[in-house]
Amino acid sequence: MSALQRTPQPASLAERLADLAVDALIDEADLSPKPALVDRCSNGAHTDLHLGLMHSSALSLWPTFKLMADAAAQFQAVGEPLREALGRLGREGEATMLRTTSGVNTHRGAIWALGLLVTAAALDPQDCGPDAVCQRAASLALIKDRQVLAQNSHGSEVVRRYGVMGAREQAQHGFPAVIRCALPQLQRSRAAGSGEQNARLDALLAIMTTLADTCVLHRAGLEGLQTMQNGAQRVLDAGGSASLAGRRALNQLDQQLLALNASPGGAADLLAACLFIDGLEPALGPVSRSA
């Protein structure tokens, strides 16, 4: 049979999950207008980030997410061997990201969150409802990676200083900001006819109403966190991003956060996680487990 007559092979499960994870990162970056975050309108509160860099970073992580899904197929169960494989792949993915961005941290938190969720989905693709996937991800996150020394990241310092739940704890508790806030708001706004982009903005704002965003705390302390949470709630109370009053409140929140140099990067990572989970069941369909 000639090459022209060959039937294309269907994408493997690992490839579909990697596609979905990268799509979630790109969709989060493109969503506009987000308060003080990189989007199609501006670079937000960042001087070292722009939309093209976010896209390049997301695309560079596709092999990492695929290998994580492959690891789930190899080990087939939550446990230390799979957890340590994920840790190694995550560190390698972070190194790839930093090479791509010339040292700028674009998606470190997203590698953690989406890496866990990709792996959790790959462990049981027949049971990919939000609660099930997040609970499997939590079980993985609770296992200590023995190859990692004590962390001194900005996020870990903020967690120690303020006693809040950081990215690690968010995962270990099954992503409550996604399950309890983002996904329900996404569904409510869709049902209200807000349009997909506004529904996603509302989901981001729902996360921001309760999240102790360590990126905001690092940059602007408790004042910044309170500004973020209260401002996001005002947008939703005004009718959400689809309403005129909500858009005015959203613009005001953007200006307030920019004045504080506070960018809700933790909320952005969790929105990407929300979009990944939201797209799981529609995207998987019949899959091949072959690599």
Swiss-Prot record:
Signal sequence extent: none
GO biological process: prosthetic group biosynthetic process
Catalyzed reactions per annotation: 3'-dephospho-CoA + ATP = 2'-(5''-triphospho-alpha-D-ribosyl)-3'-dephospho-CoA + adenine
Disulfide-bonded cysteines: none
Family: Belongs to the CitG/MdcB family.
Keywords: ATP-binding, Nucleotide-binding, Transferase
Naturally occurring in which organism (per UniProt): Pseudomonas syringae pv. tomato (strain ATCC BAA-871 / DC3000)
Function: Involved in the formation of 2-(5''-phosphoribosyl)-3'-dephosphocoenzyme-A, the prosthetic group of the acyl-carrier protein of the malonate decarboxylase.
Gene encoding the protein: mdcB
EC annotation from Swiss-Prot or TrEMBL: 2.4.2.52
Coiled coil regions in record: none
Gene Ontology MF term list: ATP binding; triphosphoribosyl-dephospho-CoA synthase activity
Official protein name in the record: Probable 2-(5''-triphosphoribosyl)-3'-dephosphocoenzyme-A synthase
InterPro entries, sorted: CitG, TriPribosyl-deP-CoA_syn
